[in-house]
């Protein structure tokens, strides 16, 4: 029972630029309503009582973060991020060396629901490995021919999931797996892939498909719609 009461720290890698958004401003600083995407993402984490600290890894040349109210928030720590996501996450983990469990959440994923976060955090009661929020694949999936815009074959979707964030792991285990994977030149696309590389099998915790990452211009309007809908539902 005590495991469910442990405080949790979160790491938010926010040093990327997001060139697919086709904007001069990094996507995490684009606004939805009266807040930036980064603020929406961080506030969703801090809304849960177990999340007591959020470490945000930003680019060393970032001048935008200091202009946000987040810069003066007592539960937020800022560190310099790296060139790659894994480097930024490791920098964040160094800042919470005493934490037992850590969340890692995308800076540009502002639509996290509190019930999803609560279900993910609950796995710390019985898991030594952790897990991720994920959404079952619903569309028909095709694998393309290498180097061609042509279908190679249809991929069976029965056991396919979209990996989402937050992802939630024991801090020491995540640190060790990320370090080993990077040192051995493994391709790491998210934190779970580092654990997979080291032979672990994180849990899949089903989350809502509207927990989208803002990656392309059309995602911004969709995220705004989802956030507005959630606010209206909470007020109802």
From Swiss-Prot:
UniProt cross-references to Gene3D superfamilies, sorted A to Z = Spore Coat Polysaccharide Biosynthesis Protein SpsA, Chain A (3.90.550.10)
Provide the E.C. number(s) assigned to this enzyme.
2.7.7.60
Pfam families listed in its UniProt record? IspD
Per its record, the protein catalyses:
2-C-methyl-D-erythritol 4-phosphate + CTP + H(+) = 4-CDP-2-C-methyl-D-erythritol + diphosphate
Q: Which cysteine residues pair off into disulfide bonds? A: none
A GO MF annotation of the entry reads: 2-C-methyl-D-erythritol 4-phosphate cytidylyltransferase activity
Q: Which UniProt keywords apply?
A: Isoprene biosynthesis, Nucleotidyltransferase, Transferase
Top-level class of the enzyme under EC nomenclature = transferase
Q: Supply the InterPro entries for this chain.
A: IspD (IPR001228), IspD/TarI (IPR034683), IspD/TarI_cytidylyltransf_bact (IPR050088), ISPD_synthase_CS (IPR018294), Nucleotide-diphossugar_trans (IPR029044)
What PROSITE patterns does the record tag this protein with? ISPD
In terms of HAMAP family, this protein maps to: IspD (MF_00108)
Tell me the protein's name.
2-C-methyl-D-erythritol 4-phosphate cytidylyltransferase
Its gene name is ispD
């Amino acid at each position: 029972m005590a495991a469910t009461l442990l405080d949790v720290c979160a790491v938010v890698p926010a040093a990327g630029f997001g060139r697919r958004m086709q904007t001069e401003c990094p996507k995490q600083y684009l606004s939805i309503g009266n807040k930036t995407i980064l603020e929406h993402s961080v506030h969703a984490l801090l809304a849960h009582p177990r999340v007591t600290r959020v470490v945000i890894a930003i680019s060393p040349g970032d001048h935008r973060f200091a202009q946000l109210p987040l810069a003066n928030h007592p539960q937020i720590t800022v560190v310099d991020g790296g060139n790659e996501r894994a480097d930024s996450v490791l920098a964040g983990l160094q800042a919470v060396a005493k934490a037992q469990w850590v969340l890692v959440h995308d800076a540009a994923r502002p639509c996290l629901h509190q019930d999803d976060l609560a279900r993910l955090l609950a796995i710390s009661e019985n898991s030594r490995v952790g897990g991720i929020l994920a959404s079952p694949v619903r569309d028909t999936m095709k694998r393309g021919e290498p180097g061609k815009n042509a279908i190679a074959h249809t991929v069976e979707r029965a056991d396919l999931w979209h990996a989402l964030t937050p992802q939630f792991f024991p801090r020491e285990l995540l640190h060790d797996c990320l370090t080993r994977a990077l040192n051995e030149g493994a391709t790491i696309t998210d934190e779970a892939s580092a654990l997979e590389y080291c032979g672990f099998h994180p849990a899949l915790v089903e989350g809502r498909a509207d927990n989208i990452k803002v990656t392309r211009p059309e995602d911004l309007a969709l995220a705004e719609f989802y956030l507005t809908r959630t606010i209206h539902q909470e007020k109802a």
